[in-house]
Amino acid sequence: MSIFRTEEILKAAKMPPEAVHMSRLIDAVYFPILIILLVGTYHMHFMLLAGDWDFWMDWKDRQWWPVVTPIVGITYCSAIMYYLWVNYRQPFGATLCVVCLLIGEWLTRYWGFYWWSHYPINFVTPGIMLPGALMLDFTLYLTRNWLVTALVGGGFFGLLFYPGNWPIFGPTHLPIVVEGTLLSMADYMGHLYVRTGTPEYVRHIEQGSLRTFGGHTTVIAAFFSAFVSMLMFTVWWYLGKVYCTAFFYVKGKRGRIVHRNDVTAFGEEGFPEGIK
């Protein structure tokens, strides 16, 4: 027996072979288009809101980068999770979104920043959100509750972002002395590769106001990001509900137009045995 129980589902739906074949053709066209749209729109959304912090290595600091990136990244994850869970009961919406985002980012980094603009690829490496996305999907799969997913999965999405990226970006925070000035590796790379807007956009990754809390800047930033990610998950879950729910306006026998959200809105005549 197949893990997806395809034969049982088709038998219960009482679909003729022609309808099954047509459904498969529609899926073969629909889902690749959906993936391409998800890669393009999520990448554009992410670059507009968190682009500067995720573009450059010298902007990946311990304060704003762990705050901004998860808050922006959880938005699409939440909406697509609603769509896949409610319509297909598939708990991999967040992982799918993050993988699509990484595909779009790496295409941009290689062809736009490395091949076209000649920046070194390790200076424009994108951050990863896969650990938090996996926690979102696992929480939804195990609890089957969107509110618990928002509180637990959304919190872990913000908390796991910085430690999940630390093996990749940690070495760029090592100190070096350049002509008598103490810099980090990321700051030094930023001074070597001048970008449009410099010096307006030059910033050192070890400067900021969160140090007034005793120096634990990353911990404070991670917990704040986790809290806001919970709220963002809730908001975008309902946005997914608004934009991913089919509805019908049906005119009744007395001429009254009513709003329906189910496929039986136009009656049960098309079903062989009716709806029980």
Swiss-Prot record:
EC number(s) reported in the record: 1.14.99.39
Regulation: In vitro, inhibited by acetylene. In fact, acetylene is oxidized to ketene which binds irreversibly to His-191 of ammonia monooxygenase alpha subunit (AmoA).
Membrane topology qualifier: Multi-pass membrane protein
Pfam families per record: AMO
Binding site for Cu(+): 187, 191, 204
Main location: membrane
Catalytic activity: AH2 + NH4(+) + O2 = hydroxylamine + A + H2O + H(+)
Lineage top rank: taxon: Bacteria
Residue ranges of the TM segments: 29-49, 66-86, 96-116, 123-143, 150-170, 219-239
Gene3D superfamilies: Ammonia/particulate methane monooxygenase, subunit A (1.20.1450.10)
Entry note: cofactor: Binds 1 copper ion per subunit.
Disruption phenotype: Cells lacking amoA1 grow more slowly than wild-type cells, while cells lacking amoA2 grow at rates similar to wild-type.
Co-factor(s): Cu(+)
Keyword Acetylation among UniProt keywords: no
UniProt keyword terms in alphabetical order: Cell membrane, Copper, Cytoplasm, Membrane, Metal-binding, Monooxygenase, Oxidoreductase, Transmembrane, Transmembrane helix
Subcellular location: Cell membrane; Cytoplasm
Gene Ontology MF, one: ammonia monooxygenase activity
Quaternary structure and interacting proteins, as annotated: The soluble ammonia monooxygenase is a nonamer composed of three alpha subunits (AmoA), three beta subunits (AmoB) and three gamma subunits (Cytochrome c1 PetC).
Miscellaneous notes: The physiological significance of the two gene copies is still unknown.
Function noted in UniProt: Part of the ammonia monooxygenase complex, which catalyzes the oxidation of ammonia to hydroxylamine, the first reaction in the process of ammonia oxidation to nitrite.
The protein's name in its UniProt record: Ammonia monooxygenase alpha subunit
Annotated gene: amoA1
